[in-house]
A protein has these predicted regions:
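Active-site residues of response regulator receiver
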Residues: 54
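Receiver (REC) domain active-site loop signature in two-component systems and cognate sites
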Residues: 57
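Charged docking surfaces used in two-component/phosphorelay signaling
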Residues: 17-25
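His-Asp phosphorelay/catalytic-motif detector in bacterial-type signaling
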Residues: 47-49, 73-79
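Acidic, metal-coordinating helix/loop segments flanking the phosphotransfer/catalytic sites
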Residues: 7, 32-50
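Hydrophobic/aromatic residues positioned on beta-strands within the core alpha/beta folds
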Residues: 81-84
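C-terminal output helix
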Residues: 108-117, 125
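Acidic catalytic/metal-coordinating carboxylates
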Residues: 35-38, 61-67
Length: 127
């Protein structure tokens, strides 16, 4: 698989660290952010092929981060995979349905995460 630049955004330290390690072992260049504010800072400094982000975080939540990415890069926003234990909550379920972006229900297994990442990076090329 080609090397891609991925940003992992999650306020859960252990999960974020595991995801970063697994994605690096898969050959990707990976940065991480503890929340949406830090993620926006990193997104302002460099471009990413994929953002793997939690839906619920302190400060800027996943939906707000997604909207900011779309506004900053309307011609080529990064691909996104959402993660959450709250995908059944109506506001998040509606948001996920509207965006059409994939979501991983926490807790998820790492093999499933790796498969979704592979699918998003290889089967959904952005122009």
């Amino acid at each position: 698989m080609a090397r891609h630049r991925i940003l992992v955004v999650d306020d859960e330290d252990n999960l974020r660290d595991v995801l970063v390690e697994v994605l690096k072992r898969d050959g990707h260049e990976v940065d991480s952010a503890v929340d949406g504010i830090q993620a926006l800072h990193l997104l302002g400094e460099r471009s990413y092929d994929l953002v793997l982000t939690d839906l619920r975080m302190p400060g800027i939540e996943g939906p707000e981060l997604y909207q900011a990415m779309q506004q900053r890069h309307p011609e080529k926003p990064p691909r996104v995979i959402f993660m959450s234990a709250n995908t059944g909550i109506e506001q998040y379920a509606r948001f996920l349905s509207e965006t059409g972006e994939p979501a991983l229900e926490k807790p998820f297994n790492l093999a499933d995460m790796r498969q979704v990442v592979l699918q998003v990076l290889t089967q959904n090329p952005r122009p």
